[in-house]
Amino acid sequence: MENFKTDFAKTLKESNLSEKEIAFKNLNAKEFSKQGFPNRKDEDWKFSDINQIIKKEIGELKFYTGQSKETDIDEDVLLGEIKHNKLIFVNGQLVQTDFSSEEISKIEFLDNKNDTEDQSVENSLINLNNALANKSYKLLVKKNYQIKNPLIIYHVSNNKVTSQNINLKINFELEENSSLKLIDLLKDKGNKNFINIFYNFSLEKNSVLKNYKIDQFENDNIRYMFNNIKQSSNSVSETFYLSKGSTFSKNEIFCDLKGEHSSAFVNGVFSLNKNKHHEIKAKINHLVENTKSYQSVSYTHLTLPTNREV
C-alpha cells in the first residue's frame, strides 16, 4: 500500500486540480488505503480474491501513469466493417473522438469534467478509480435523439505498459426519448495490467440503452468493469457480455429501476479455458411497482459458477 500512497502523491502533484477536486481525490485515496483490494472475506468477492490474483499474476502494481507519449493508434484494432462513432483510449488515455455521423447539436461529449462529490462509496475499486483517474468523461444524448450509428469505445493497451493500474471513468446521460447503442471493444497488447473501468448511466423517461461488452482477444490482463445504472419510467437497459479473452475479469452491474415500467436485461456468453476466471455479479433493485428484469448467462468449458443476485 506504500507504493499506492507514493504514486498517488506523485499523480496529485502533477495534476492541475481545484481544491474541491483535490479533496474528492484525497477522500477516495484514503478509503482505498484503508480497505485495500477486495478479498474472499468480502461477500461480494467470495468467488474471486482479486488481492491474491494481482499478487500472483502481476506482482508489484504501479499506480502512477503520467502522460505517456506511447499512445499511437494501431489501425489494425479499428473495425472497418460497420459505420460507427468512436472513442479510442490507449493505455487509459483518450486519443481520438469521432461523432461525425451524428447531428452534433444533439449530443455533447465533455473530456474535462472532474467529479467533485464529497461522498465515499463502499467499493474500494471505485475509490481507487476516483482517486487516480485523471479526469472523468461525460456523454450526453439530448431529448428525442436516437444516435444513428453505434458508439464503439476502443479499450486498447500496447506493449509499452506492464504491471500497470489503468483507470477510466465515463458518465452517460440519456435524456427523455433518446437512445444509445454502445459497444465496449477490448483489444490488448499490453499484458499483466490491472484495468479498472467505471461507468455511470442516467436513463430518463422512455430512453433506451444497449451496451455490448466484447472481451474476445487473448490477453494476460486483470479487468474490473462496473456499470452503475439509474432508470426512470419506461426506460430500458440491456447489457450483453461476450467474455473470453482476459486472464481474470469481473463485471458488476448495480441498477436502480426508479420509474414504473422500466426494465433491465443482462445476458452473457462465457467461453473460457480452465486457467481463466470470469464472473458477472448483477444487482437490480425494483424500487417501484411494474418493473421488470431478466438475467441469462451461459458458459462453455471449465469455469466457476456465476454469482448473480436480484
Regions found by a protein language model. Name each.
Residues E103, L110, D115-L302, R308:
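Conserved beta-strand/loop scaffold segments within soluble protein domains that form the structured core
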Residues M1-L168, E173, N177-S179, L186:
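N-terminal leader/transition segments
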